[in-house]
Amino acid sequence: MLAHDLVARPTQDLDLFTPVASEVDPLVAALAEALRGQGARVEVDRRGPGFSRLTVETVDGHQVAVEIAHDARLRASVQLDFGRLLHPDEVAADKTLALFGRAAARDLVDVAALTDRYPLQQLCALAEEKDSGFNASVLADAMSAAAEHPNDAFAELGLSEEATSRLRSKVQEWRAALLTANTENPTRPSPAATRRPPPLAPPPPTRPRRPEHDLPPTRHGREGPSLSL
């Protein structure tokens, strides 16, 4: 999102995606080798099917988390001066699904920023296009749960108390709009949706981060790795 100027907030991680699951492990090995060749310390913290998380410490002591994952592709990636990036529509879908799935404070901040470019209903349409298990009512509950994180969680993301208060007010508006739209245009919940109950409370601060891409992919792209910032 930072690379597309979709949001301005502190971040300490880098996400890399490929539409080919078998490419994840070779990409992890190649990246780790290249970084170590530059003097960085690299540790693989987590590894699973189609996903790895690395902690990288540069020679000057800067630390960053890097996640490499398999993810379905809705749109062709775009080329910028420094490399290929996920299409903005793809980023919008992923961030909406991240809020839908884990209700983290940063997800709410990201989706709020996206509404400057994408109407809420378009975000929902993109999310449903990528994951047929998406449900607007569940997203409404996830927004409410994310808004319940303490002010400190939003302060870490660069929001003042006043900005956090405005965001929580917007959440009430968005929740009402989502529930109204879902009532007027009801859809049958898919099995995937029923596996994701509405968040009842925000996760505790010590809860390990769930990767944004851990939602089940429903489509398969043909392009190579792209990154999301």
Predicted ranges, named:
Residues P191-L229:
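Non-Sec secretion/translocation targeting segments of pathogen effectors
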Residues M1-R195:
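Compositionally biased terminal segments of proteins
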